[in-house]
UniProtKB/Swiss-Prot annotation:
EC number: 4.1.99.22
Catalytic activity: GTP + AH2 + S-adenosyl-L-methionine = (8S)-3',8-cyclo-7,8-dihydroguanosine 5'-triphosphate + 5'-deoxyadenosine + L-methionine + A + H(+)
Entry function: Catalyzes the cyclization of GTP to (8S)-3',8-cyclo-7,8-dihydroguanosine 5'-triphosphate.
Domain Radical SAM core: residue ranges: 24-242
Chain sites annotated for binding [4Fe-4S] cluster 1: 40, 44, 47
Gene Ontology process terms (BP): Mo-molybdopterin cofactor biosynthetic process
Subunit structure: Monomer and homodimer.
Protein name, entry field: GTP 3',8-cyclase
SS bond partners: none
Keyword presence, DNA damage: no
Domain of life: Bacteria
C-alpha cells in the first residue's frame, strides 16, 4: 500500500485534474471522514449522554451507497479516507465497505484508515490489514481500568488492550488519541506518553470540544493544552518538529523517549487555515466544518439517479460553502455546546 505518513511513502499517480475541489479560501479538499454509524458500544462522558437516542436504522445509507459516495469523492480528488463513528467497527458488515475501499488504494486513493475505541479490534485487525489499512487511531484516555470504566461507562479496558495487541501483531501502526480532561486524566498524560512510545506508538492529546448535550459540565473538563505542555516540559524535553499526517495535530519529539507527541488545539489555537477535509455522515449529510452547523444533503442526489452527475454537482455546491473557520468556544456563561450535534454523528 502507498502511504502518506509524514514524509515517507509514494503517493499514487494523480490525474491531470488532481485536487479539483477547492474551497472559497483556496484550500484543496483531499480528505474525507466518513461516519459509518452514530452508534457506539461506549458512552464516553465527554462525547455523549448515557441514554442516547440514535438514528433509526432505516435512515442509514447502505454500505453500497457509502461506497458509491466515497468513489465520487475519490474521483473529485480525495486521497485519504478515514472511517469513524460512533464506533465504526460495530456497524454490521462494515468489512464489506473496508474491502471495497481497499480496492481503490493506488487507484486514486492513497490511504484508508479509521478511528476506533479498540473494543472490536481483536476480531478485525488481520482483515483490516489484508484490506490495505496500515495505520489507525485508537482512542484511549487512561491506563487505569477503573477510571477507564468511569469515563467510557460501558467499556472493557482489557478488550481494548487485546485489540491494540492484535493490531500491532497484524502489522498496523497505531496512534493513540487522548482527550485531555482537567482533574481526570491530566496527571496521567506522562504515563500514557511512556506507554505509547514504549510500544512504538505516537500519542496525540486533544482539547475537549463543545459538541452536543452531555451529562458532564464541559467548563469543568476543559484544559488548554498550552497548560498541559508546560507541565510536560517539567519532565520531558519537547522539540517542535515538521511532521504532517494530513491532520490538524502539531507534533513535538520527546527527546527522552524518541517518540512523537501531537497536540490538537481546536479551542486555543485552531487549525482552520490548513483544513483539507469534509465529513460525511451515515445518512448522507455532508458537513463542511466540524464546528459549524451548515450541511449539505447528498442522499437526495445519490438516490435521484444511478448517474453520478447530479451527485458531483451537489458535492461541488457544498464545497463552495466551506467556511473559513469553526465556531468552537467554551461558553462558561450558559454551559451550552457551540454545536448541537454530538461528536458521534460526525466522528470528530
Amino acid at each position: 500500500m502507498n502511504t502518506r505518513i509524514g514524509t515517507t511513502g509514494n503517493a499514487s499517480p494523480l490525474a491531470a485534474d488532481a485536487y479539483p475541489m477547492i474551497d472559497p479560501f483556496g484550500r484543496a479538499v483531499t480528505y474525507l471522514r466518513v461516519s459509518v454509524t452514530d452508534r457506539c458500544d461506549f458512552r464516553c462522558t465527554y462525547c455523549m449522554a448515557e441514554n442516547m437516542t440514535f438514528l433509526p436504522k432505516k435512515d442509514l445509507l447502505t454500505l453500497e451507497e457509502l461506497d458509491r459516495l466515497c468513489s465520487a469523492f475519490i474521483a473529485k480528488g480525495v486521497r485519504k479516507i478515514r472511517l469513524t463513528g460512533g464506533e465504526p467497527l460495530v456497524r454490521k458488515n462494515i468489512m464489506y465497505l473496508v474491502r471495497q475501499l481497499g480496492k481503490k488504494i493506488g487507484a486514486g486513493l492513497d490511504e484508508l484508515t479509521l478511528t476506533t475505541n479498540g473494543s472490536q479490534l481483536s476480531r478485525h485487525a488481520e482483515e483490516l490489514y489484508e484490506c490495505g489499512v496500515r495505520r489507525i487511531n485508537v482512542s484511549l484516555d487512561t491506563l487505569d481500568p477503573e477510571k477507564f470504566r468511569k469515563i467510557t461507562r460501558w467499556g472493557d479496558f482489557s478488550k481494548v488492550m487485546e485489540g491494540i495487541d492484535a493490531a500491532q501483531k497484524a502489522g498496523i501502526r497505531i496512534k493513540l488519541n487522548a482527550v485531555a480532561l482537567k482533574g481526570f486524566n491530566d496527571a496521567e498524560i506522562p504515563d500514557l506518553l511512556r506507554f505509547a512510545h514504549g510500544r512504538g506508538m505516537d500519542l496525540t492529546v486533544i482539547e475537549t470540544m463543545p459538541m452536543g448535550e452531555i451529562d458532564e459540565d464541559r467548563t469543568d473538563q476543559y484544559l488548554p493544552l498550552s497548560e498541559l505542555r508546560a507541565d510536560l516540559e517539567k519532565q520531558f524535553t519537547l522539540t517542535d518538529i515538521d511532521y504532517q499526517t494530513g491532520g490538524p495535530a502539531r507534533y513535538v519529539r520527546v527527546e527522552e523517549t524518541g517518540g512523537r507527541l501531537g497536540f490538537i488545539t481546536p479551542m486555543t489555537h485552531n487549525f482552520c487555515e490548513s483544513c483539507n477535509r469534509v465529513r460525511l455522515t451515515c445518512t448522507g449529510t455532508l458537513y463542511m466544518c466540524l464546528g459549524q452547523n451548515d450541511a449539505a444533503d447528498l442522499r437526495a442526489a445519490l438516490r435521484a439517479t444511478e448517474d453520478d452527475a447530479l451527485l458531483h454537482t451537489a458535492i461541488d455546491e457544498a464545497i463552495t460553502r466551506k467556511p473559513k473557520g469553526h465556531d468552537f468556544i467554551i461558553d462558561r456563561t450558559h454551559n451550552r455546546p457551540a454545536v448541537a450535534r454530538h461528536m458521534s454523528v460526525t466522528g470528530g
